[in-house]
Structure formats: structure tokens, C-alpha cells
Design a protein with these regions (language model features):
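Catalytic, metal-anchored helix/loop core of enzyme active sites in primary metabolism
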Residues: 432
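Flexible, glycine/charged-enriched surface loops at secondary-structure junctions
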Residues: 94-98, 241-246, 293, 324-331, ...
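Short beta-alpha connecting loops at secondary-structure transitions
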Residues: 211-219, 441-448, 457-468
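Long, contiguous, secondary-structure-rich segments that constitute the structural scaffold
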Residues: 463-545, 551, 629-647, 651-752
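Extended redox/cofactor-interaction regions of prokaryotic respiratory oxidoreductases
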Residues: 114-191, 197-202, 226-229, 315-429, ...
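Internal, active-site/partner-interface "lid" segment
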Residues: 242-262, 493-510
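Active-site phosphate/pyrophosphate-binding segments
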Residues: 231, 249-373
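N-terminal export/assembly segments and adjacent metallocofactor-ligating motifs
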Residues: 1-238, 267, 275, 393, ...
Length: 752
């Protein structure tokens, strides 16, 4: 019997609404939901392949427990017993920081990943937290924290109303957008062009996005912050800086101008390989546009000056009067955000509240660099204990972190490891307990994180499209039970975790004079919550307490879970609106243009004015049909353009004697890999490009299709000690490499 069901796609940040076709409990098709209030029918190849991913035969169907050195199928009870027996003794003997927690990118794509890891981390009490953020967007969190007082307060470009959009290090035609949730990003960019707007792309590669642009500038990798600083300098130098209506809420303008005095267009031109007059033109056009927005992403984050580049993106939006302005860059307001507080001074944002044990990296946003995980496991010091047990949730750092070989060995030395993962992959193969969540069609979905980054305010929720298969456990229950096992409450009802969070949240809300439930009885409020499960009751609570909520009866027209369920295609909450100064949490209550940590890092950027790479440098590459290391086991999403090839410019290929399709050895500070060359002028001379997330050739995994064409692990080329010092983010782009023909190719050539 065939039927359809709605499901929000969890496979990238666009969060498109899908209509799934289901036959006999199995997803057999997916199409875009034309009635979805946000995505309006858009679908990409990943969403279209939802059914293939959902039914991948290599997905684990039940838990695995290591017995006598081998992972064997086990019951859930055996798995929880083993988990509690492995984690608690480490905490009790060595302390909470000896237990590390690693969170992968898929956590932000699930309800469970949003709701339970914070409880797990707090329950253990560990400072040893490592996530995918420090190989991705942590610089943006840090710059936002320093500018606005809240690391999660990230302005997004108002794509649908802007007249001028400048993208740096971003390729949304392949990524579908990142830190900017926008279904049909390609269509929105085409609409910008159609209404007479201007699109500028700054990227060392001529990406699909660059090919759509009015102007593409192939910047030298790693010099993004220099270019942006020179643009800001031009605005000051030519009297073009105009803060507009937000001027009363901004401080530090004169200090910023002085700090950027050395970064003239002439001073940075050679380093960036963009001439001074072009830099001035970029700044002038930005200032002259009726509305404009600058947007930077992973290419400008994963470089030595990632935090400075992220900061300067928002500095340019401020200096042109486009921050918090329709058509500029605005702050979304999600339905599950906390109740808005009156504007005023906040607590500010702090870095370095604790440090890593080995190299003393400062924490950022509660996290330590993922690049430091291996050394935190394998290197003893006189201070503190090494990480002896590891909880990995949807994480594959052996592929996603620099120097995966070292981490691979380090994981084998742990006293205990538990992995929540649907696959036995390059990382989870080391676990003593593997806890597989069900396929996504069997899970509910609400986007807690991505709604705070969406280009339009809206709220959507979908319940599981198909019921849990026999023997499977909901991911929410898996993580709730993991909380209990790790905190000494093994055997308790997992619903107790949700009840505890609800009770604590409501108790705090009724004490808050700005809350809609101030002074009320928290137990009576809890009794009003609806939902079929603990996670749904928590969602209902967050909606009711949020900026659009009913306030538990205070606003009869406000949001509740019941109202959301009555609108299966979502509820549109309107375009983004100016919000300053209300969301600011800086100590001044204003946008602080030149925070002290930023000012202290500027001398390092000045030194970069004289730096020039002597040879080839490496950059990464996005694929539309992939997302990090996730999807290489789905035949429908591999092959074609989604291949692990090394892009080499024809001039470099000729100089080095590299032929198209030839296996090439790539050598970096961290090691070497071999990949087939793809000779193309899509990269600028002196730059080679290799995508990330590949390298599925390690023994002991169960990902059959991925192993057929495993690709090369680009992170093995990288120096794990090379980080952006403010954020701890890994430097993945602009790193020096050398090329040489593979042994087989060299032998073939010598035989000719």
C-alpha cells in the first residue's frame, strides 16, 4: 500500500520540505513539498536520494559490543550495561575531564543531537569537548561573540531583498548555503541578478557560484582578511563609512579606523593578488549600493586568520550601514529562541576559560580544537589526565580532522569508547560500544539550530514518516539513556532526562521578571505541555516560552506544539526584521567594533602583508551530492562530478608534467596521499583543490560502496598544529603542498 508523508530534509542546512512516498514501510521516493512555507518545492539531489540513504543496507540495525577484541551484535540492555561499565569507572578514577565528548556535524541536523548532548556534557562535567565546529565555522562564532556578546548571534544576508551581495569563500550553489539557511539558494541568487542586483564572488576557484556572478576575483588562498581589511580601510579613507540608523548602538569606530591604518589597498594588493584599484572599487560599490550584504563562509574560516576574516565581514556590513537593515545582514529570530529581554548591557563573551592540557589551547564557546584530540589522548603531561574514555556522537574525526593517522592510532589506545553512529566507519570501528540510531524517516524533525540562521522566520515540525522498526531504538532515547549511563543513573527511566530539563527550565522561567510565565507555578505549567514524547514536550515548552509563543495562555494566538501540528507544511513568521539593540549581550550593550582579542591579533595579520607562498597551495572543494564524509555509501550520490580528484591548473600541470587522469602524489606537512589529477582552469595557477570527507579505505569498516571508490583523505596532508589562535579552528586552506607523479605513473612514463 503506497502513501505519502512529510519530512524536513536533514541532509544539509537548506532544510527543505520533502514529500516522501512510502510503500510497505519503506521510503521509495522523495519530491519537494510545494506547500512548504519555506522551501516551496525546492529539492536537491541529496533530498531526492533520501530513500536510498534511508534504506542503505550497510546501516547498523542493532548495537554492537566489543567482546574479546571483536565487535559483536548485542541487545540494547547489554549495550547499556557495557556503556555504564566503561564510562563511570573512568570518571570516578581520573575525573570528569578524562572523558572526552566528540560531536559531529550531523548533530545539528537532528532533534536528538540538539536536545541531549548539552545535558550529557553537563552531566559528566567534562571540559574535554571537541566538535566539528573547529574544522568549520568556529571563527564566525568567536567573531560574533566578540562583536555582539553572543557566539550564536550570527547575522545572515537578506538574500531576497538585497541589491548587492559579496560572497567570500562561499559556494552556495554546491553547499546549498551554510550559516545562512536558504532553500533554493541558487534560485535566490538568480533572482538577485534578475532584479538588477549585483553578485560578486571572491574565491580562488571558479566555482558554480562564481560562474553565476557579475564579477569573480580569484584571490590568493588565505588572504581573505587582508582584502577585507583593505576594503574597510578604503571606506574610512574616502569618507564612505556611514553607520546609518544603527550608529547609536555601535562603539569603537575611531579605534577601528586607526587599527586598520596599515592595510591600504596598495599594501595588500600583492599578497592577495588583487590590484589596489579593484579593491577600492569593491569598497565603493558596497557603499554606493542601496542595500548590500557581505557573506563569508568556510573558505574564509578555515585559514590562518579565520576569526579576523569573519570579524571583517561584519565590520564591512556595519561600516556601510547594512547591519540590521532590510536588504543587508539581519539577525533571524527563531520560534524556539529564548524570550526577548530588554536591551541593555550583558555578560559579554569570554575566551580561554580553560585550556587544553598539552598545548594550552584556549577554549572557545566551551570547546577545544578537534585538531588537538589525538594529543589529548596520546600525550601524557604533568598537569591533568589524558582523555581515557571517549563518547562520539555522529562523529568521524579520523576522516574529518587533520592528521587522521595519529588520531586513528590514539583511538586504539583508549580505555573505553562509545560511538552513536548508524555506520561502522573509520572512527566508530574503534568503539567498544556502537549505538546505531534509526534511519531518518523513523525520526521526528525540527531545526533548532538552522532556524536561528534562516533567511526568513518560520517554524516547521515533522513527526516520523514511518514507525520504528522492531529492534530499533529512537535516537532521542539512545541519547537519553547515554546521559543516564554516563552520569551514574544507569537503569533509570530515560524519560527522567526530559522531565529534569523541563522542570529546571520552567523553574528558571518563573523567576525571570521578563518571562511571560513570571510568578506562575512551574508544576502547573509542566502539566499543560502536550506531545507524544519527552522531546515533543520539550519542543512545546520552548515554543510557548519563545518570542512567538502563547506564553502558556498569555497570548491565545501564540505558538504551541498543537498549533504547529495543525500546520504540517509549517508556519511563516515573516521576513527578517531589524532587532538592534535588543539581542546584544556585550558588556556595553552595543556592537563592539574592536574587541581586545581582535586588536591583539592584528599584528599577526600585519606580518602577513609580507608573506608569499613559494609553491603550490591547497584548497578544499564542495560537492552538491555530498556532505562531508556522510554520503559516499549511497550509489545515487557518487560518481559524476562527485569524485575525489585533484584539480590542477593547466599551467601547473604542464610545468610539473602532470597529465589529466594521472595518479598524483600530494605531499603536505602532515603526510601524503594519492589522487587522480583533473586538469582544469577552474582553479587559479599555483592552487590545487582536493575535496574533504574521503579516504574510505581503512580496514574494519562496513561501508561497502564507499570502499569501492574510497578517495583520498585530504586531512592527512595537513599539519594538525596549524590553527587560527583565536578560535582554535584548523587551517585547511592555503596550506603548502608538493606534487609528484605516483610510483605507477612514474614507471609508466619511464617505460615510454
Amino acid at each position: 500500500m503506497s502513501r505519502t508523508a512529510l519530512r524536513i530534509c536533514p541532509l544539509c542546512e537548506a532544510t527543505c520540505g520533502l514529500v516522501l512516498t512510502i510503500d510497505d514501510g519503506r521510503v521509495t521516493g522523495a519530491r519537494g513539498d510545494r506547500e512548504d512555507v519555506f522551501s516551496k518545492g525546492f529539492i536537491c539531489p541529496k533530498g531526492a536520494a533520501f530513500g536510498a540513504l534511508d534504506s542503505d543496507p550497510d546501516r547498523l540495525r542493532g548495537p554492537l559490543v566489543r567482546v574479546d577484541g571483536e565487535l559483536r551484535e548485542a541487545t540494547w540492555e547489554e549495550a547499556w550495561d557495557a556503556g555504564a561499565a566503561g564510562i563511570r569507572p573512568v570518571v570516578e578514577r581520573y575525573g570528569p575531564h578524562a572523558v572526552g565528548v566528540v560531536l559531529g556535524n550531523p548533530n545539528v541536523h537532528t532533534m536528538a543531537g540538539a536536545l541531549y548532548p548539552p545535558v550529557l556534557i553537563a552531566g559528566i562535567g567534562t571540559h574535554s569537548l571537541f566538535t566539528a565546529s573547529t574544522v568549520d565555522q568556529m571563527p564566525k562564532h568567536v567573531s560574533s561573540g566578540l562583536l555582539f556578546g553572543d557566539a550564536n548571534l550570527i547575522p545572515v544576508p537578506d538574500l531576497d531583498r538585497t541589491d548587492h551581495l559579496l560572497l567570500i569563500g562561499a559556494n552556495p550553489l554546491e553547499s546549498n548555503g551554510s550559516l545562512c539557511t536558504a532553500p533554493d539558494f541558487p534560485g535566490r541568487l538568480k533572482a538577485l541578478r534578475a532584479r538588477g542586483g549585483t553578485l560578486t564572488v571572491i574565491d580562488p576557484r571558479r566555482t558554480r557560484t562564481a560562474r553565476l556572478a557579475d564579477r569573480h576575483l580569484a584571490i590568493r588562498p588565505g588572504t581573505d582578511a587582508l582584502l577585507l581589511a583593505a576594503m574597510a580601510h578604503t571606506l574610512f579613507d574616502e569618507g564612505l563609512a556611514d553607520l546609518g540608523e544603527r550608529a547609536p548602538h555601535i562603539q569603537g569606530l575611531d579605534e577601528l579606523a586607526a587599527a586598520l591604518d596599515d592595510f591600504t589597498p596598495e599594501a595588500v594588493a600583492s599578497a592577495c593578488d588583487i590590484d589596489a584599484e579593484t579593491i577600492r572599487t569593491l569598497a565603493r560599490e558596497l557603499a554606493a549600493a542601496p542595500t548590500a550584504a557581505v557573506y563569508g563562509r568556510i573558505g574564509s574560516c578555515t585559514v590562518p586568520h579565520g576569526t579576523l576574516a569573519s570579524w571583517l565581514v561584519d565590520v564591512l556590513n556595519v561600516l556601510t550601514g547594512n547591519l540590521d537593515r532590510p536588504g543587508g545582514a539581519l539577525f533571524p529570530q527563531a520560534a524556539t529562541d529564548r524570550t526577548p529581554r530588554p536591551a541593555g548591557p550583558g555578560r559579554g563573551f569570554a575566551l580561554g576559560r580553560w585550556h587544553s592540557r598539552v598545548r594550552r589551547h584556549p577554549e572557545a564557546k566551551g570547546e577545544l580544537p578537534l585538531s588537538a584530540l589525538a594529543e589529548e589522548i596520546d600525550t601524557p603531561t604533568d598537569e591533568g589526565e589524558p582523555v581515557r574514555a571517549l563518547v562520539a556522537v555522529a562523529a568521524n574525526p579520523v576522516l574529518s580532522a587533520p592528521d587522521g593517522n595519529r588520531l586513528d592510532k590514539a583511538l586504539g589506545s583508549l580505555d573505553f569508547m562509545v560511538s552513536v553512529d548508524p555506520y561502522l566507519n573509520e572512527t566508530s570501528r574503534h568503539a567498544d560500544v556502537v549505538l546505531p540510531p534509526p534511519p531518518p524517516a523513523q525520526s521526528p524533525h525540527h531545526d533548532f539550530a538552522f532556524n536561528t540562521l534562516a533567511v526568513r522566520n518560520q517554524v516547521r515540525y515533522t513527526r516520523p514518516a514511518v514507525p520504528l522498526e522492531p529492534g530499533r531504538m529512537a535516537e532521542t532515547e539512545i541519547l537519553a539513556r547515554l546521559v543516564l549511563a554516563a552520569t551514574g543513573m544507569h537503569g533509570a527511566d530515560p524519560a527522567a532526562v526530559d522531565t529534569l530539563v523541563i522542570d529546571q527550565t520552567l523553574a528558571k522561567a518563573v523567576r525571570d521578571p521578563h518571562s511571560p510565565v513570571h510568578g506562575r507555578d512551574p508544576q502547573q505549567l509542566a502539566a499543560q505541555l502536550t506531545g507524544d514524547s519527552g522531546p515533543e514536550r520539550r519542543l512545546d515548552m520552548m515554543l510557548r516560552l519563545g518570542p512567538y509563543g502563547d506564553g502558556f495562555g498569555a497570548d491565545r494566538d501564540g505558538l504551541t506544539l498543537d498549533r504547529l501540528l495543525a500546520h504540517p507544511h509549517g508556519i511563516d513568521l515573516g521576513p527578517l526584521r531589524p532587532r538592534l539593540p535588543q539581542p546584544l549581550k556585550t558588556r556595553s550593550g552595543k556592537v563592539e567594533l574592536l574587541p581586545e582579542p581582535i586588536a591583539a591579533d592584528l599584528p599577526r595579520l600585519r606580518a602577513a602583508l609580507d608573506e608569499r607562498p613559494g609553491g603550490l597551495v591547497l584548497v578544499g572543494r564542495r560537492h552538491l551530492r555530498s556532505n562531508n564524509s556522510w554520503m559516499h555509501n549511497v550509489p545515487a550520490l557518487t560518481g559524476g562530478s562527485n569524485r575525489c580528484t585533484l584539480h590542477v591548473h593547466p599551467d601547473d600541470a604542464e610545468r610539473l608534467g602532470v597529465r589529466d587522469g594521472q595518479p598524483v602524489r600530494v605531499k603536505g606537512a602532515g603526510g601524503e596521499v594519492t589522487a587522480p589529477a583533473e586538469v582544469t582552469d577552474a582553479v587559479r595557477p599555483g592552487v590545487v583543490s582536493l575535496p574533504h570527507g574521503w579516504g574510505h579505505d581503512r580496514p574494519g569498516t562496513r561501508m561497502g560502496h564507499a570502499a569501492v571508490d574510497p578517495g583520498a583523505n585530504v586531512n592527512q596532508l595537513l599539519d594538525g598544529s596549524l590553527l587560527d589562535p583565536l578560535s582554535g579552528n584548523a587551517v585547511l586552506n592555503g596550506v603548502p603542498v608538493e606534487l609528484a607523479p605516483s610510483a605507477a605513473a612514474a614507471a609508466e612514463r619511464s617505460a615510454l
